[in-house]
Amino acid sequence: MAIQWFSSSDNDPERYELLRRSFELGWIAEDTRPSMPDAATVKTKWNNDEAIMLPDILADVIDRYSTDLEQSHKLMERTLNGEEIAPKIEAEPYASRLNPKFPLLSAVFEEHDEQCIEKLFFDAEENGEVIGEDLWCKASWLSFDDNDASMRFRFSFGMEGYEDVAADPERQMLASELTDAIFPESAAITEHPELNKLLAEMVGAKPAYTERIIYFNAPNGGAQMHHDVERGHLGVVFAQMSGSTGWLAMAKPVLIDEIQAFLELPESEAALAKVLPDIDSQNALRELAEDRAALSCHMDEFDHELSEALMDRCPEFIKHLFDRGYGYILKPGDVLLMPQRDLETCVWHTVFCTSEDPGEALSFALRRID
């Protein structure tokens, strides 16, 4: 077993705490580092909708971007301290990388989005002509928890949540270039020969990286169990650049299998009662779990509290998933690939910060260039 789950640290410095939004979900340790899979294995796993870890694949370039990573960390810290982002972006080292192609047009604070910190709008220009409108970089908190400092910088364009971004690949790529200008360490993925060769073989075409997000997962933070399915995207390439994160990742049908299997265990009764004290809620989840289609639909709903309580707040279920071999610990230079073929087969995943300070990671959607 590569990752072991423990109920306490036992003062072992090799164990990482699983603490998120003040929920204590155990401790994990890595028995052995996984080996790098060969290209055939990567392709097979990808086609089978399995998460794939590529350990240390970017280790040879991390030092190359040390200055950029340090600058990005400073931007994150200043944002945490309540400083506005726009004035920083208009100064060096950002100004010379953005201008003249990406002039900053405005910065807003979206009142309708309580997690929004600041949203910056840009146009893309070439020879004085606008070639791409309404590009944006949005800084947001990952949760509403005051004790979770996790944040992200997301890059896209158009009306957030309404625009079919896959229908405009030109603006998608311009938003990707905007990411490069603000976070040059993005090149660790986009310009890495070995990684790009591997991904090209995996998807059967030249890879493109769109809908980019720069994450800073902080202690007591991370992401709850979710998927990242979006039309036109094949999956997600996640690269740990600093700090470390703990993961659980598996295809949705496998996750449903494990929910059903866990609820059949005698010990599930007491475990479930701790996260769903109401007996009617416990019975409702068990009833859902008896019908795969009903459980699958429930998981896709915005409000899926019954399954969320189990997947995100139940230490015994977290242990069950780690014991079953779905866990990963990512360190600087590691990459995790997660297929997102469709809503029925996509890899669901949950993330924990396992470092003492916020760590930076790159999360890029993968699409083909045919």
Give, region by region, the residue ranges found by the protein language model.
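N-terminal accessory scaffold of Fe(II)-dependent oxygenases
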Residues: M1-L337, R341-D370
